[in-house]
Amino acid sequence: MNAPTTFADSVTVPVSLGDRSYDILIGKGLVERAGEEVAKRLKGVRVAIVTDENVAAVHLERLQASFARAGIDSTPVIVAPGEKSKSFATLETVTNAILVAKLERGDAVVALGGGVVGDLSGFVAGIVRRGMNFVQMPTSLLAQVDSSVGGKTGINTAHGKNLVGVFNQPQLVLADTQVLDTLSPREFRAGYAEVAKYGLIDRPDFFAWLEANWQEVFSGGAARTKAIAESCRSKAAVVARDERETGDRALLNLGHTFGHALESATGYDSSRLVHGEGVAIGMALAYRFSARMNLAGIEAAERVEAHLKAVGLPVSLAEVPGGLPPAEKLMDYIAQDKKVTRGTLTFILTHGIGQSFIAKDVPPAAVLEFLKERLAIA
């Protein structure tokens, strides 16, 4: 069991993958400790710090100072903020910057940012010189509890989200809870959707705890650290069992089949929809669709929607600004989902709170009819 170990100033959650195991450190002040922690694990490295313009303005100087104190030379590579940086063009830009800096295979790529920066940086680290070291320093709640853990990396294409990438586990994850204080309320809410997801997958006790304590999670302190640690613990356990998503790791995609389709439909325009908002709507739809298919009671869907609404997250197609294309177009995006096998649809559905399961061969006609109904309500 990947039980978190508590220290005076941080929590450590191990990810057990044999000789590729690594630690997730969670706590305050980890930006300042980053140089020390990296130096313990990666001797004599130089690093490329990949970050976006917004994060760089707030955290880059402190991180570079931390590396300098540890005797680690760092080269910043700054990209534009937002989902559109998960592109072939930005991939080429970052790759070229690392090669121009003459970083070697034994050096490290450090991702300082949210899920976009982490996904992009991990892909770069996996392909430059056929594989460099990789350190995740997630600065959003979403990245701290989800995308920084487990080794999924990649970019988007015109055909859909995350369709080009590699599995590339980091050597270390440093989740500084203090940096979350700089997030906008919208960004924090979006990350919270992934926290709630872990309770909805297979931990009804955790979901009930979130229903009772979400305000404390938002305000910070011990409840926030607990929510992050428990989320990481849940994901680490799944990744240890199924690193390459050949089995139950697919459960972590609860809400993502619908959510990714909505992100694609909005052109990855973060002014309209960010990933966590898509996941929130996607989870609500997954519970509604499960009820429609007589797999779960409507009470579970209503409870999920009530909690997500309480924290300020969207739960319906009507809440996507700018409207959506017809159901047939949404189905085209769903058909590009990575869980599609030989043309058949796979969804993560549910029998109730904390009772999610992998549903194979879901009838496309049923999904299409469901989407038409939900769009009509919108």
UniProtKB/Swiss-Prot annotation:
Keywords: Amino-acid biosynthesis, Aromatic amino acid biosynthesis, Cobalt, Cytoplasm, Lyase, Metal-binding, NAD, Nucleotide-binding, Zinc. It comes from Brucella abortus (strain 2308). Zn(2+) binds at residues 194, 256, 275. It is an enzyme of class 4 (lyase). Belongs to the sugar phosphate cyclases superfamily. Dehydroquinate synthase family. The gene is aroB. Binds 1 divalent metal cation per subunit. Can use either Co(2+) or Zn(2+). NAD(+) binds at residues 115-119, 139-140, 152, 161. PANTHER family: 3-DEHYDROQUINATE SYNTHASE, 3-DEHYDROQUINATE SYNTHASE, CHLOROPLASTIC. One of its GO terms (cellular component) is cytoplasm. It catalyses: 7-phospho-2-dehydro-3-deoxy-D-arabino-heptonate = 3-dehydroquinate + phosphate. InterPro entries: Dehydroquinate_synthase (IPR050071), DHQ_synth_AroB (IPR016037), DHQ_synth_fam (IPR030963), DHQS/DOIS_N (IPR030960), DHQS_C (IPR056179). Catalyzes the conversion of 3-deoxy-D-arabino-heptulosonate 7-phosphate (DAHP) to dehydroquinate (DHQ). One of its GO terms (biological process) is chorismate biosynthetic process. This is 3-dehydroquinate synthase. Pathway: Metabolic intermediate biosynthesis; chorismate biosynthesis; chorismate from D-erythrose 4-phosphate and phosphoenolpyruvate: step 2/7. It comes from the Bacteria.
